Amino acid sequence: LIGLVGSEMCIRDSDDPKENAEHVMLVDLARNDLSRNCHDVKVDFYKEMQYYSHVIHLVSRVSGTLREEADPVKAFIDTFPAGTLSGAPKVRAMQLISQLEPHNRGAYGGCIGFIGLNGSLNQAITIRTFVSRNGVLWFQAGGGIVAKSNDEYELQEVNNKLGALKKAIEMAEKM
C-alpha cells in the first residue's frame, strides 16, 4: 500500500525498497496459500497502481485452478487470515498480534460475502468497514509494519485510510 495520494509520492513509493519488499512478501503469501489446494498458481498482474480517494494501492492478483480432489470450502478457509492483515510468517505474526493488540479485532480483517447456489463465491476482506454495535459505530484501520518501516509514515498511512471513513461520516451527516 502506498499511503499518500499525489503523483510525486506515487512515483517515489513505487520504487521504494521497503514498499516493494512488503509487496513481494504479500504476493508470496498469497501464492503459498493458494498452492495448498490449487495447481497452476500464477500472478495475473503485478504491482498495478490503483488510486482511491485517500490512498494509492500497489495491487497484484494471484489465482489458481482448484485441484479436482480439493475441497472448495477448505481452500477458502486456507486463505485466511489474508497475509495482508497477518504478515509473515503467518502463524507467528498472528501470535504476536494476539499478544500485542489491546483487543480482539472483531469483524476487522475477517471477510464478508456469499456462496451462490451455483457454487460461485464472492467475498471481501472487512477492512475500512463500519460496524454498528450497541448503538456505537466502530471502524478501524491498520498498516503493515516491517523492519525498515518509518513510524511516522506508517501512522500517516493509517490516518489516510481512516480519512476516507471519516469523510463518509461527514457526508452522511449532511444527508
Segments the model singles out, each with a brief description of its role:
Residues 2-4:
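A short, hydrophobic C-terminal helix/tail in secreted or cell-surface proteins
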Residues 7-8, 12-175:
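Extended alpha-helical targeting/anchoring segments
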